């Protein structure tokens, strides 16, 4: 299956009438998302563009997965998605009980403290996701970013057309800050502690 054909294939899927081929396309798309070969959003000419079909694939993926028990040593979870297991192969450091969910991608050199990175998220090399921070679904985090303790980066799977949160290279997000609703934090920006940024936050 070729990546360049996936957009058309996903766009033509009827969620109410899934064929075996449709299921294979959905599984393959999330597999490529998990490997970092495709992304929910991509940058072109200093603008971030939403790849709506990738997010559609995530929603379809949830619809075809069943809940099941997932073991992590003595811990038992009940969910549709397993956490990633190839941290060493990826070259990322994950401190217990940190979780990077299947379908998220972290470049080599990322440090994940006890925190959570959700499906569709992309985290660039050299970034620190500090203790109890959350990187929500589809969020795009650049290289050498510091997400301080307790930071909440909002996730966006719905509604259709909504942009994910983007934090660009070299940004610093202060402790307990909340960034949601498709906010774009540009390269090298510094956000102080306990700041909340939403799509309606006035910037003066």
What spans do the regions from the language model cover?
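Structural signal for interior beta-strand "rungs" in well-ordered beta-sheet cores
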Residues: 92-204
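Terminal amphipathic alpha-helical/low-complexity segments used for targeting or macromolecular assembly
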Residues: 1-92
């Amino acid at each position: 299956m070729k990546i360049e054909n996936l957009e058309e294939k996903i766009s033509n899927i009827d969620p109410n009438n899934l064929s075996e081929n449709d299921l294979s396309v959905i599984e393959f798309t999330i597999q490529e998302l998990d490997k970092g070969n495709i992304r929910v959003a991509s940058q072109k000419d200093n603008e971030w563009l939403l790849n709506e079909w990738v997010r559609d694939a995530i929603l379809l993926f949830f619809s075809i997965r069943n809940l099941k028990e997932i073991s992590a040593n003595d811990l038992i979870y009940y969910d549709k998605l397993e956490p990633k297991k190839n941290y060493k192969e990826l070259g990322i450091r994950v401190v217990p009980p940190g979780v990077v969910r299947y379908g998220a991608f972290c470049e080599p050199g990322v440090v994940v403290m006890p925190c959570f990175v959700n499906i569709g998220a992309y985290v660039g090399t050299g970034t620190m996701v500090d203790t109890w921070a959350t990187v929500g679904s589809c969020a795009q985090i650049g290289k050498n970013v510091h997400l301080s303790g307790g930071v909440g980066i909002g996730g966006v799977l719905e509604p259709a057309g909504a942009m994910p949160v983007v934090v660009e290279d070299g940004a610093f997000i202060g402790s307990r800050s909340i960034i949601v609703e498709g906010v774009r934090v540009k390269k090298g920006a510094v956000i102080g502690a306990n700041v909340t940024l939403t799509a309606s936050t006035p910037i003066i």
